[in-house]
């Protein structure tokens, strides 16, 4: 279509020229004493056009001639710029391939090319960012080579370059350097330095998933359990882990926080710092109760912490595994001396509803021992002793049966029970 239009235009121009020049009788007379030259108007116009064309070509030729030095300089700068980018890409490729010495050399070559360009007064739009990335790649390679002196030198230069904020430099460049510095501090087992690097980040950058992961590792490494727990909660909200992994991580940190309490007041303060979902975790509640028992605190409060776990076990017997059921029984057994009537009713009701559960038989039997219900205690503990799997509970069962036999002055049964208890290894 375009060619057809060009042909039509060409035909139109040819027709116009033919109409204008075909019957044109005009002449142009040039007086140059003593000469006189008569030229037709058509020839005059043709000569003018030819002169204009020659002048235009001559000017273009002169312009091209005088621009040769500038074009040669631009060509040299382009070659150096290409070499710079090639060296930077080579450094990244060598780093990813695990060739750290070559990666560092390539990064240093990129820095040398950038300095050469700067010496030629070449202004690259991304010069500052290229310098920062080159230093960062060199520092990363030095870290892999265990050359901490070179790593720190390149890191400091990268920080200095990124601190000079220009219009064309993005803040993410400096944030990336700070995150890598925090990671290297973690690799050096220097958690305070890693946390200090993370604190230098802007507020928005501190809440990114990568920064939170680094903060979590640094806090755990530095034994800052509260900070680690808060960070783990944020990561769970950001879905940085799977639900199971997040729950396991939070559960472990909550348990560690409770373990750090050295008196009942500290334990209660740590318990209050936990969220409701964390308090409902069986492992956390049982561990809190065990710590309260170990610290000789309020056993009624410990039983109150265990109540949701107990109700869950009664309503859904399979919701707790055998290990948690044993821990729950141990925690409740430790407070049987001060247990109230409500808890005794709960224990008795749960044992009646599930008469084959050896753990419940043991707990109910020990409760009967504390209440001096010898006959019922003898019956429950005898059945429990035949089915218990936990070595400690099994051993305590036979010890209790031996004490009951001694109370009845039955020396033979007491001796047999003590013998069975001695045969069981303490955990």
Role assignments for model-derived ranges:
Residues 83, 124, 131, 174, ...:
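Residues that mark the junctions of alpha-helical repeat units in TPR/alpha-solenoid scaffolds
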Residues 44-75:
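Transmembrane alpha-helices and immediately adjacent membrane-cytoplasm interface residues
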Residues 108, 149-161, 190-202, 225-238, ...:
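Alpha-helical repeat scaffolds
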Residues 90, 131, 138, 181, ...:
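Structural register within alpha-helical repeat arrays
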Residues 146, 174-183, 317-390:
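Alpha-helical adaptor scaffolds
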Residues 97, 145-146, 188, 222, ...:
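Structural motif corresponding to the intra-repeat A-B loop/turn of tetratricopeptide repeats
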Residues 94, 135, 142-143, 185, ...:
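Residue at a conserved register position within TPR or TPR-like alpha-solenoid repeats
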Residues 74-182, 188-193:
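Membrane-proximal, non-transmembrane interface segments of integral membrane proteins
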